[in-house]
């Protein structure tokens, strides 16, 4: 039954993430906060892969059997995890660059707010989708008998735009501080 679905990429990603977790816990080489963020990133990616498989399976085989509230929970958690990756990667890079010491207190606090506000908006859009579904469909819907349906409006694109924003900001800050980064830090950033 699983072979009828196109799970190749999800299963491959899941296996890579499990291998990463296994070898990661064999030897830790980065400080504790960075270690926590890195392990959280890998756990979130693993959760994304599992939820993607569960969502696809529910759409194809269990459309009428799984309660809609469980489907909403799966989809909202999946999109939250997908968008959390870019935020956590930005935090991971900023911790490795030790920006708290390089920036003034005011500038560093601005950077924190700059990271939190778009992410909070993104999560708000994702988790309001089931609440506002009957009034105004946001990014996606769960339709009885059909399953997951992507809405063709701007609300579907906003979480992806916010994710891209985090990756671009991280890339720009890495370029700005490229001369200050040691070889080992560059290696850690390229995980």
Residue ranges and their predicted role:
Residues 1-3, 69-81, 145-159:
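Short aromatic-rich membrane-water interface segments that cap or initiate transmembrane helices
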Residues 88-158:
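Membrane-anchoring/interfacial helices and their immediately flanking loops
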Residues 25-39, 94-111, 174-185:
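Membrane-interface helix-boundary motifs at transmembrane edges
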Residues 62-69, 91-97, 166-177:
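Juxtamembrane/interfacial segments around transmembrane helices
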């Amino acid at each position: 039954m699983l072979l009828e679905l196109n799970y190749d990429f999800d299963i491959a990603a899941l296996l890579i993430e499990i291998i990463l977790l296994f070898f990661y816990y064999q030897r830790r080489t980065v400080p504790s906060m960075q270690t926590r963020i890195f392990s959280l990133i890998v756990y979130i990616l693993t959760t994304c892969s599992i939820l993607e498989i569960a969502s696809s399976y529910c759409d194809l085989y269990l459309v009428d059997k799984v309660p809609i509230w469980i489907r909403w929970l799966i989809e909202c958690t999946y999109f939250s995890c997908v968008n959390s990756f870019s935020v956590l990667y930005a935090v991971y890079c900023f911790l490795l660059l030790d920006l708290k010491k390089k920036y003034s207190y005011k500038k560093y606090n601005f950077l924190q707010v700059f990271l939190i506000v778009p992410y909070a908006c993104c999560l708000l859009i994702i988790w309001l989708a089931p609440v506002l579904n009957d009034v105004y469909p946001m990014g996606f819907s769960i339709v009885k008998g059909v399953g997951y349906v992507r809405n063709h409006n701007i609300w579907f694109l906003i979480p992806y735009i916010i994710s891209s924003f985090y990756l671009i900001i991280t890339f720009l800050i890495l370029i700005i501080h490229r001369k200050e980064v040691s070889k080992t830090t560059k290696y850690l950033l390229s995980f």
